[in-house]
Amino acid sequence: MGSQNSKPAHKKYSKLWQALHKTHVTRYGLLADPLIGTSSTVQEECDKALRKSLIRKQNGNMTEEERRLQEGDTWEEWSDDEEEVGFPVRPRVPLRQMTYKLAVDFSHFLKEKGGLDGIYYSDRRNKILNLYALNEWGIIDDWNAWSKGPGIRFPKCFGFCFKLVPVDLHEEAQTCERHCLVHPAQMGEDPDGISHGEILVWKFDPMLAIQYDPNREYFTDMHGLVKRK
């Protein structure tokens, strides 16, 4: 108390206190996750890399799909994830029934994207169409039904602007490698499960959105679409 050393010390601390008050205030934000805002494919690739490393350490003779490698096989031969195309496995939007407007919008969307017009029909492709409508658009898969053959198959869902048209393959197309083995052009599958020996192709027809005859047997007014039009 009152010693000579106390005054210099007091001045020292007061200068330090003033210097601190003159320092500019720095604002700090929240630390961001490096994966936030990036595409989901980045996270999926990280997850695949992690699972791949775990599988290799635990059991080098098993693949990611739990297939046991045979003698002479390598793990890389089964790792073909780069060639796979991503597809949602569950609906990403609320489920809903097909309506007239939704059927027309969905048809024109498929036409603009070029994903259906002129494509050979097959049961597998028809199931993929159902899955796409369910998972991406939330459309319950009770809309994709067709009139009976032979001849042109019309959609039973009013507003869907695609029909199945029989086509004849010329000789060059029949011998082309693209149409061999299990290609839909050679399988001749039919939506009603009865083989009529026809090769069907999806064909866009905008008139299906305005032409509706309730007396024609191939139309079924699903969910009262005409009333809700």
Swiss-Prot record:
Residues 76-84 are annotated as: Acidic. It is found in: Host cell membrane. The keyword Transport does not apply. Seems to play a role in optimizing the host cell environment for viral replication without causing cell death by apoptosis. Enhances virus infectivity and pathogenicity. Probably involved in viral immune evasion mechanisms. In infected CD4(+) T-lymphocytes, down-regulates cell surface expression of CD4, CD28, CD3, and MHC-I or MHC-II molecules. One of its GO terms (cellular component) is host cell plasma membrane. A lipid is attached at residue 2 (N-myristoyl glycine). It comes from the Viruses. Keywords: Host cell membrane, Host membrane, Host-virus interaction, Lipoprotein, Membrane, Myristate, Viral immunoevasion, Virulence. GO terms for molecular function: GTP binding. Belongs to the lentivirus primate group Nef protein family. It comes from Simian immunodeficiency virus agm.vervet (isolate AGM TYO-1) (SIV-agm.ver). InterPro entries: HIV-1_Nef_core_sf, HIV_Nef. This is Protein Nef. The keyword Membrane applies.
